[in-house]
């Protein structure tokens, strides 16, 4: 097993210092008779371009400013109050769920939030303004990450001492990825990571000990992967130089929402593309060609599927940067059908374990970039 040094509290210390620097700048502006402001990059694909060389989206520099004016008085107050709350969390080494942060604001008088989405948006704006992850500011989502199993040891420092989880000794269960993966120390001698769209397929592969037969780490994405899941996979990939193979349903959602988010990021978190995206990831299936080659049971494309494909071909810089993806999506459009991972059960419950995945993993020419 390759062991890395334990992760320190440095990210939270950096976040705290950035909060202090921003507050100091606003104070200096006030003392000079200027309106204090908080500048942040615009968090949307309109402020990004796909850099094929890097394999991820890059911000193009569009910014917005939150200024202490009559029109922005409330949102500015909400932003500074949230900044203060984040500083308190870091100073006390505490955390707040996004839901808790919303309710904390109910004690802020006129600066309170009317709904949680507005509160979440301010937290993500601060994340963008400071250039740090919201988790490093002390804010975590309600949901945990996904499940993981395989040749991996996870070491976590707890108040009771060092906790070691051996992901090969969990019976039929799996390790649940926590919200903040920064504090985890990871040891592995696996050959690759297999990220799986559905919990059902993950359960099948785990039950058959696919990870043991192929010396790989299995990660359940549970649909579009949560931030914690993406950061966990990215750490394993970068720290242990592990290839990341992705196994989704053969449909536009699996390709352009789930796989695309893991590989190059999402529009909402475009400012974090370098911290969350995994450009080296590859999709091994289910591809449109697999549907033909393996004669899989199918369902007709829905209207929303067709719309998603056409939009991707026309407007998605990721798709437009890869001829292989353009060809695959046009092929699916011509076929007019989609297929689920579980459709491989047509040939028996163990077919995906004994035949399909071993063949796909071995033949890189069938992968999509």
Swiss-Prot record:
Ordered alphabetically, the record's keywords are: ATP-binding, DNA-binding, Isomerase, Magnesium, Metal-binding, Nucleotide-binding, Topoisomerase
In this chain the Topo IIA-type catalytic domain maps to 10-146
Required cofactor(s): Mg(2+)
The catalytic activity, as recorded, is: ATP-dependent breakage, passage and rejoining of double-stranded DNA
Record InterPro entries: Spo11/TopoVI_A (IPR002815), Spo11/TopoVI_A_N (IPR013049), Spo11/TopoVI_A_sf (IPR036078), Topo_VI_alpha (IPR049333), TopoVI_A (IPR004085), TOPRIM_Topo6A/Spo11 (IPR034136), WH-like_DNA-bd_sf (IPR036388)
Taken from the record, one Pfam family name reads: Topo_VI_alpha
User: What's any GO biological process attached to this entry?
Assistant: DNA topological change
- The EC number(s) attached to this protein equal 5.6.2.2
Record's cofactor remark: Mg(2+) is directly coordinated by Glu-197 and Asp-249 as well as indirectly coordinated through 2 water molecules by Asp-251.
User: Active-site positions, per UniProt?
Assistant: 103 (o-(5'-phospho-dna)-tyrosine intermediate)
An example Gene Ontology CC term for this record: chromosome
Coiled coil (UniProt feature)? none
Database matches in CDD domains: TOPRIM_TopoIIB_SPO
Q: Looking at the keywords, is Magnesium present?
A: yes
Task: Work out whether the entry's keyword set contains Ligase.
Answer: no
Top-tier EC class: isomerase
Molecular function (GO) terms for this protein are: ATP binding; DNA binding; DNA topoisomerase type II (double strand cut, ATP-hydrolyzing) activity; magnesium ion binding
Q: How does it assemble?
A: Homodimer. Heterotetramer of two Top6A and two Top6B chains.
Role this protein plays: Relaxes both positive and negative superturns and exhibits a strong decatenase activity.
What protein does this entry describe? Answer: Type 2 DNA topoisomerase 6 subunit A
Q: Which organism is it from?
A: Methanocaldococcus jannaschii (strain ATCC 43067 / DSM 2661 / JAL-1 / JCM 10045 / NBRC 100440) (Methanococcus jannaschii)
């Amino acid at each position: 097993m390759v062991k890395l040094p334990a992760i320190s509290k440095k990210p939270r210390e950096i976040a705290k210092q950035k909060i202090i620097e921003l507050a100091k700048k606003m104070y200096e502006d006030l003392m000079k008779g200027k309106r204090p402001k908080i500048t942040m990059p615009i968090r949307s694909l309109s402020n990004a371009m796909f850099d094929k060389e890097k394999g991820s989206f890059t911000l193009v520099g569009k910014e917005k400013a939150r200024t202490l004016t009559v029109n922005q008085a409330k949102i500015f107050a909400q932003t500074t109050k949230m900044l203060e709350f984040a500083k308190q969390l870091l100073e006390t080494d505490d955390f707040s769920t996004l839901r808790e942060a919303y309710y904390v604001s109910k004690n802020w008088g006129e600066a309170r939030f009317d709904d949680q989405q507005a509160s979440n948006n301010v937290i993500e704006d601060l994340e963008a303004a400071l250039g740090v992850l919201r988790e490093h500011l002390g804010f975590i989502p309600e949901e945990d990450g996904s499940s993981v199993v395989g040749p991996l040891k996870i070491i976590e420092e707890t108040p009771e001492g060092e906790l070691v989880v051996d992901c090969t000794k969990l019976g039929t269960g799996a390790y649940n990825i926590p919200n903040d993966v920064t504090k985890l120390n990871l040891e592995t001698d696996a050959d690759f990571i297999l990220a799986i769209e559905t919990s059902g397929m993950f359960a099948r592969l785990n039950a058959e000990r696919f990870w043991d037969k192929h010396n790989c780490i299995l990660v359940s994405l549970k649909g579009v992967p949560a931030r914690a899941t993406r950061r966990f996979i990215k750490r394993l990939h970068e720290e242990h130089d592990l290839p990341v193979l992705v196994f989704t349903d053969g449909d536009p959602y699996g390709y352009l929402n789930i796989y695309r988010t893991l590989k190059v990021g999402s529009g909402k978190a475009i400012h974090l593309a370098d911290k969350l995206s995994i450009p080296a990831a590859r999709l091994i299936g289910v591809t449109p060609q697999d549907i033909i080659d393996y004669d899989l049971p199918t369902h007709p494309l829905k209207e929303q599927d067709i719309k998603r494909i056409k939009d991707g071909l026309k407007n998605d810089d990721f798709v437009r940067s890869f001829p292989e993806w353009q060809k695959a999506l046009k092929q699916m459009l011509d076929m007019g059908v989609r297929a689920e991972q579980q459709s491989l059960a047509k040939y028996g419950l163990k077919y995906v374990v004994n035949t399909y995945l071993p063949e796909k993993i071995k033949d890189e020419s069938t992968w999509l970039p």
